[in-house]
């Protein structure tokens, strides 16, 4: 008997779990009771509960002791006590992976599975399938087929769900049960129909045509189960995505028809599916939004929450589509459920007008302290979107954010606010000084190291450009005096950036850095000593290279190259150009983690996509002498349609003097295998094809890779743009789709692919230059050239900027890819590295009259990159 605990025990937490202090050895000793006769069902069930508790708490049972306990437990099948029998089933499932020879209970389970006691049959099916492997499955196949079509819903559902689990290890056997599953799918029981539909889909999911037929059949005859409808909607939406989402498809019509279903869960599932379809227009969203609007006034909190959460998601891409719901959303602002109220307000922030912002901010302020950090982050994200939409409201929004920043909150919440403030500072120069001042106040009492170092990095980047940079020095130096070593190191870096950009402040900065040289921490001392020595040289090029812009190489690549250098001693100094560059995504204009990463690196930095390619190419003998990989194209280029018999995608790899084309090939014909697959290429310009590395075999639906090696132009090095015609050549061998047997004889064949373009962007790696002016001075004007062009087909500055960035493949610096409103002039600043490791910078001045006139000035450490830029633009 378990003792009864009083309320005091419950509140203190003492004794709330009677199984809390179990010992494995004691429990296994108790399990010997299973061998006693007569069987005591209540006592044995309690011991089984203890064993299950130990297993689920992660207690390790040795194979021998688990097997002994399991064999003892099998004797409990002699008892007809229903509770004890159900506990036996649970124990069999849990111990099937630990104990040996668990198949000893097969006959007992089969007997229960085919017996007259319905309460035993379903659990017996589940337990039997848990201990059955692929070799034994055929022995119980007949029983499984009978169970699937059983008239008792619990038995049928158990068999269907167990079949779904068995698919992973015995697909071919379970596939033979499709007829029984089809019969079960017409059941009147909602769970049986749902489980049968799930099994049918998973058997056929790799055959798109079979899935389409299944959807067509069940949508035509209708379904009784709302769960089955929900699953069918998900299958149909997945199929729509794979078919590039044609809205004329009967699949879309089916999903839309489900908006009129009598079950609320089906209606919501259909609305959610339409909302999440890629490329959905506002017109196609309208019926889904109307349904969600009705749910907003539902008496059920779950429906109101689901509706407003989904509308919030729609408002991110299609705010105009949600505008019709604004009145309903305003009613939800006062909802008693704070989660619903928060989502309603953030949705209104995305869809509301500029005039409603002040009122909404007051409403948010009234309950911000009552909601969780998770929803506070949602509010901050909505405010961030609002800042971009209504720049004139920056002042109101900034004040609200600063108030939130001063309140209590967790890391994610504070980080979201800091992100938002930084984006406002970068978007709106008028709010820069106000924003920096508030961030300075925040780091005076900031408990989060990551945020403190990030703000210090921002101060070092933006502070020197303000009207009165000296006012930030006190806040930064306070961090050196008061904080721990990571923040102190970030503060030292920020101080150095002020000294590198402001000659008047340099003497004061040098004094502060000299004090930091005596710091207790190695990192802080090393930084201070390094920056002190660089600044004392008073050379702009050194300041730019070692303080303001820093390294642009990949950290894992640098680590690997240094390790290789130490393993193979050489008299030559280490060449930094042999290290792959850090690829910077176009969307990431802010160097958010630079300061933090410099202070404390994570234990293991994940290899980038380019580093993975580097390893793969280094393993090919033909590419051994090519040197380090400079760049891989960001996205593979499709050279065939996705529905054709062969799917070919090409990735371009650039080396200092060569290009390697990697062709990822998939054979979608199940009655043939391709061998010795190569892609023959013919260039239109001065490129020279050197060799081909074939894919030895390309069986049905198994990807393979072949390569083509090409030498870059030598006679005219500026002729880097080129078009290659491509033909795939291979040997075809027929094979039996059922057995996979391949014919010995084959025949030669070829397949014409789309042409492949090589552009100037394939020869340039984009890099971030935080301080473009310093980088410009660092490169110098020795190899500077300038030309003026007219872009006759372009009518706006935004279009011109977008085209130039895409064409040159360089990184826009200092947010110069954002064109201010109502301006007819703009300067675009671009940075990159040309193959071979040569910095290349471009300053493009744009003037809009009737057409766009562009003055391009290019600088590099070598003449060739400058010539290539101007030749390609011309």
Curated annotation (Swiss-Prot):
<dbReference type="GO" id="GO:0072384">
    <property type="term" value="P:organelle transport along microtubule"/>
</dbReference>
<dbReference type="InterPro" id="IPR012295">
    <property type="entry name" value="TBP_dom_sf"/>
</dbReference>
<keyword id="KW-0597">Phosphoprotein</keyword>
<keyword id="KW-0677">Repeat</keyword>
<dbReference type="GO" id="GO:0005198">
    <property type="term" value="F:structural molecule activity"/>
</dbReference>
<keyword id="KW-0813">Transport</keyword>
<dbReference type="InterPro" id="IPR013040">
    <property type="entry name" value="Coatomer_gsu_app_Ig-like_dom"/>
</dbReference>
<keyword id="KW-0653">Protein transport</keyword>
<dbReference type="InterPro" id="IPR009028">
    <property type="entry name" value="Coatomer/calthrin_app_sub_C"/>
</dbReference>
<dbReference type="InterPro" id="IPR037067">
    <property type="entry name" value="Coatomer_gsu_app_sf"/>
</dbReference>
<dbReference type="InterPro" id="IPR017106">
    <property type="entry name" value="Coatomer_gsu"/>
</dbReference>
<feature type="repeat" description="HEAT 2">
    <location>
        <begin position="283"/>
        <end position="320"/>
    </location>
</feature>
<dbReference type="Pfam" id="PF16381">
    <property type="entry name" value="Coatomer_g_Cpla"/>
</dbReference>
<dbReference type="GO" id="GO:0005829">
    <property type="term" value="C:cytosol"/>
</dbReference>
<keyword id="KW-0931">ER-Golgi transport</keyword>
<dbReference type="InterPro" id="IPR011989">
    <property type="entry name" value="ARM-like"/>
</dbReference>
<dbReference type="Pfam" id="PF01602">
    <property type="entry name" value="Adaptin_N"/>
</dbReference>
<dbReference type="InterPro" id="IPR002553">
    <property type="entry name" value="Clathrin/coatomer_adapt-like_N"/>
</dbReference>
<dbReference type="GO" id="GO:0030126">
    <property type="term" value="C:COPI vesicle coat"/>
</dbReference>
<comment type="similarity">
    <text>Belongs to the COPG family.</text>
</comment>
<dbReference type="GO" id="GO:0016192">
    <property type="term" value="P:vesicle-mediated transport"/>
</dbReference>
<protein>
    <recommendedName>
        <fullName>Coatomer subunit gamma-1</fullName>
    </recommendedName>
</protein>
<keyword id="KW-0472">Membrane</keyword>
<dbReference type="GO" id="GO:0051683">
    <property type="term" value="P:establishment of Golgi localization"/>
</dbReference>
<feature type="region of interest" description="Interaction with ZNF289/ARFGAP2">
    <location>
        <begin position="609"/>
        <end position="874"/>
    </location>
</feature>
<comment type="function">
    <text>The coatomer is a cytosolic protein complex that binds to dilysine motifs and reversibly associates with Golgi non-clathrin-coated vesicles, which further mediate biosynthetic protein transport from the ER, via the Golgi up to the trans Golgi network. Coatomer complex is required for budding from Golgi membranes, and is essential for the retrograde Golgi-to-ER transport of dilysine-tagged proteins.</text>
</comment>
<keyword id="KW-0963">Cytoplasm</keyword>
<dbReference type="GO" id="GO:0000139">
    <property type="term" value="C:Golgi membrane"/>
</dbReference>
<dbReference type="InterPro" id="IPR016024">
    <property type="entry name" value="ARM-type_fold"/>
</dbReference>
<comment type="subunit">
    <text>Oligomeric complex that consists of at least the alpha, beta, beta', gamma, delta, epsilon and zeta subunits. Interacts with ZNF289/ARFGAP2 through its C-terminal appendage domain. Interacts with EGFR upon EGF treatment; interaction is essential for regulation of EGF-dependent nuclear transport of EGFR by retrograde trafficking from the Golgi to the ER. The coatomer interacts with KDEL receptors; the interaction is important for retrograde trafficking of KDEL-bearing proteins from the Golgi to the endoplasmic reticulum. Interacts with COPB1. Interacts with TMED10 (via C-terminus).</text>
</comment>
<dbReference type="InterPro" id="IPR013041">
    <property type="entry name" value="Clathrin_app_Ig-like_sf"/>
</dbReference>
<dbReference type="Pfam" id="PF08752">
    <property type="entry name" value="COP-gamma_platf"/>
</dbReference>
<feature type="modified residue" description="Phosphothreonine">
    <location>
        <position position="594"/>
    </location>
</feature>
<feature type="repeat" description="HEAT 3">
    <location>
        <begin position="322"/>
        <end position="355"/>
    </location>
</feature>
<feature type="repeat" description="HEAT 1">
    <location>
        <begin position="64"/>
        <end position="101"/>
    </location>
</feature>
<dbReference type="InterPro" id="IPR032154">
    <property type="entry name" value="Coatomer_g_Cpla"/>
</dbReference>
<feature type="repeat" description="HEAT 4">
    <location>
        <begin position="356"/>
        <end position="392"/>
    </location>
</feature>
<keyword id="KW-0333">Golgi apparatus</keyword>
<keyword id="KW-0968">Cytoplasmic vesicle</keyword>
<feature type="region of interest" description="Disordered">
    <location>
        <begin position="1"/>
        <end position="21"/>
    </location>
</feature>
<feature type="compositionally biased region" description="Basic and acidic residues">
    <location>
        <begin position="1"/>
        <end position="11"/>
    </location>
</feature>
<dbReference type="GO" id="GO:0006886">
    <property type="term" value="P:intracellular protein transport"/>
</dbReference>
């Amino acid at each position: 008997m378990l003792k009864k605990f009083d309320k005091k025990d419950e509140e203190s937490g003492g004794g709330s779990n009677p199984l809390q202090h179990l010992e494995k050895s004691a429990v296994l000793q108790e399990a010997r009771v299973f061998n006693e006769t007569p069987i005591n069902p209540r006592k044995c069930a309690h011991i089984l509960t203890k064993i299950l508790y130990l297993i689920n708490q992660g207690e390790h049972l040795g194979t021998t002791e688990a097997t002994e306990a399991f064999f003892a437990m099998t004797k409990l099948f002699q008892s007809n006590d229903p509770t004890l029998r159900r506990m036996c089933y649970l124990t069999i499932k849990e111990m099937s992976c630990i104990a040996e020879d668990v198949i000893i209970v097969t006959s007992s389970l089969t007997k229960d599975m085919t017996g007259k006691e319905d309460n035993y049959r379903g659990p017996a099916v589940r337990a039997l399938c848990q201990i059955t492997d692929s070799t034994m499955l055929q022995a119980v196949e007949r029983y499984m087929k009978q169970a699937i079509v059983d008239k008792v819903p619990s038995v049928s559902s158990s068999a269907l769900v167990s079949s779904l689990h068995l698919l992973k290890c015995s697909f071919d056997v379970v596939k033979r049960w499709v007829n029984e599953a089809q019969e079960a799918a017409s059941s009147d029981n909602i769970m049986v129909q749902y489980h049968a539909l799930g099994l049918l889909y998973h058997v056929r999911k790799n055959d798109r045509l079979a899935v389409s037929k299944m959807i067509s059949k069940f949508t035509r005859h209708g379904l009784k189960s709302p769960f089955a409808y929900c699953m069918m909607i998900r299958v149909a939406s997945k199929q729509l995505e794979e078919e590039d989402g044609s809205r004329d498809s009967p699949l879309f019509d089916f999903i839309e028809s489900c908006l009129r279903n009598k079950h609320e869960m089906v209606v919501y599932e259909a609305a959610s599916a339409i909302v999440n379809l890629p490329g959905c227009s506002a017109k196609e969203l309208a019926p889904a939004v109307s349904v969600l609007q009705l749910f907003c006034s539902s008496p059920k909190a779950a429906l109101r929450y689901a509706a407003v959460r989904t509308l919030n998601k729609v408002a991110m891409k299609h705010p105009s589509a949600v505008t019709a719901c604004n009145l309903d959303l305003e009613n939800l602002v006062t909802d008693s459920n704070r989660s619903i109220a928060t989502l309603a307000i953030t949705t209104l922030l995305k869809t509301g007008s500029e005039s409603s912002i002040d009122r909404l901010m007051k409403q948010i302020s009234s309950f911000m302290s009552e909601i969780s950090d998770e929803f506070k982050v949602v509010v901050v994200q909505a405010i961030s979107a609002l800042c971009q939409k209504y720049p004139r409201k920056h002042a109101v929004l900034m004040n609200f954010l600063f108030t939130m920043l001063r309140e209590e909150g967790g890391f994610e919440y504070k980080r979201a606010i800091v992100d938002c403030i930084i984006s406002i500072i970068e978007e709106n120069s008028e709010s820069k000084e106000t924003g920096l001042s508030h961030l300075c106040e925040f780091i005076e009492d900031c408990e989060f190291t990551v945020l403190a170092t990030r703000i210090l990095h921002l101060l070092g980047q933006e502070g020197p450009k303000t009207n009165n940079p000296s006012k930030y020095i006190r806040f930064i130096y306070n961090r050196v005096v008061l904080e721990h070593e990571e923040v102190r190191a970030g503060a030292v870096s920020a101080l150095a950036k002020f000294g590198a950009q402001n000659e008047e402040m340099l003497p004061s900065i040098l004094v502060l850095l000299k004090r930091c040289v005596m710091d207790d921490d190695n990192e802080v001392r090393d930084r201070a000593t390094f920056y002190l020595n660089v600044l004392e040289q008073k050379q702009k090029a050194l300041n730019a290279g070692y303080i303001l812009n820093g390294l642009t190489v990949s950290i894992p690549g640098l680590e690997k190259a240094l390790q290789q250098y130490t393993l193979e001693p050489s008299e030559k100094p280490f060449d930094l150009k042999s290290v792959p560059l850090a690829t910077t995504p176009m969307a990431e204009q802010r160097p958010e983690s630079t300061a933090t990463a410099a202070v404390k690196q994570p234990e293991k930095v994940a290899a980038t996509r380019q580093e993975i390619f580097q390893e793969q190419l280094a393993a090919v003998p033909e590419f051994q002498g090519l040197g380090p990989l400079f760049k891989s194209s960001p996205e593979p280029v499709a050279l065939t349609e996705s529905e054709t018999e062969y799917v070919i995608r090409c990735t371009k790899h650039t080396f200092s003097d060569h290009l390697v084309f990697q062709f990822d090939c998939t054979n979608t014909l199940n009655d043939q295998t391709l061998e010795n697959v190569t892609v023959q290429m013919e260039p239109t310009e001065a490129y020279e094809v050197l060799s081909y590395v074939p894919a030895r075999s390309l069986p049905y639906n198994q990807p393979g890779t072949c390569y083509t090696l090409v030498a870059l132009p030598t006679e005219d090095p500026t002729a880097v743009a080129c078009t290659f015609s491509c033909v795939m050549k291979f040997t075809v061998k027929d094979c039996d789709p059922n057995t996979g047997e391949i014919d010995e004889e084959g025949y030669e064949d070829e397949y014409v692919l789309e042409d492949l373009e090589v552009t100037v962007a394939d020869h340039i790696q984009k890099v971030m230059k935080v301080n473009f002016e310093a980088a410009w001075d660092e490169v110098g004007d020795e190899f500077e050239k300038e030309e003026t062009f007219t872009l006759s087909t372009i009518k706006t500055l935004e279009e011109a900027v977008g085209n130039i960035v895409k064409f040159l493949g360089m990184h826009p610096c200092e947010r110069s890819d954002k064109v201010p409103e109502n301006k007819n002039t703009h300067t675009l600043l671009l940075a990159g590295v040309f193959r071979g490791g040569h910095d290349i910078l471009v300053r493009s001045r744009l003037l809009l009259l009737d057409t766009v006139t562009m003055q391009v000035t290019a600088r590099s450490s070598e003449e060739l990159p400058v010539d290539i830029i101007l030749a390609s633009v011309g």
